[in-house]
Amino acid sequence: MAFDQSGVSMSIPKRGFAVSEYERRLDNIQKLMFESKMDAILLTTQVDIEYYTGFKSQFFQSPTRPWYVLIPSSGKPRAIIPTIGESGMRDTWIEDIQTWTSPNPEDDGVSILLSNIKSLMVNHKSLGVPKTLESTLRMPLEDYETLIKNLPGVEIKDANKIMRRVRFVKSEAEIEKIRHICQITSQGFIDLEGFLRAGESEQENCRRFKQHLLKLGVDDSPY
């Protein structure tokens, strides 16, 4: 059970988000895609894929397999992922899930991804890829270069700016979860003095702090 600074138990928000939350996010980004003349956006990172699909998986911790989601200018996102993640993705609101057996050094999902991108280049021949501040491309650079080489005439635009605009405005459901985790973290720091041990290493004290946060109710504390 988690507690606030006065020791009063806090209400725990329901885990995950309703489908309506993902629909809201999709609607917001597609409006900005329309303004920016983008036919699709390619997502490759855990945080971006989770934001638009709700897909959570420890498989992202492994650098072996790439994961792709395409946001079209209209309609629901398409997931193009290794077969190892298919069952988890089917628990989300995503319906179009295409898979390949990974790792496959000869073709680690690139041909499926390329085919889907080409099918979406119908209005502006423009693909959005997060390029700028705080963005990351989570796929082999060689595969990305192969992808771009096989998209002649397609303009690659930065999608990061419009994706950030969507994230800047939080829904009530998001605010509720942010408030909850901030309360837990604050309580953890309040309790910090009580379990620090003089003479122990920073690593040992950090480990104890992380264990305490887990007891208070966080899912993880990576740093």
Model-based region annotation:
Residues 208-223:
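Acidic, glycine-rich loop-and-beta core segments that form the ion-binding/anion-interacting portion
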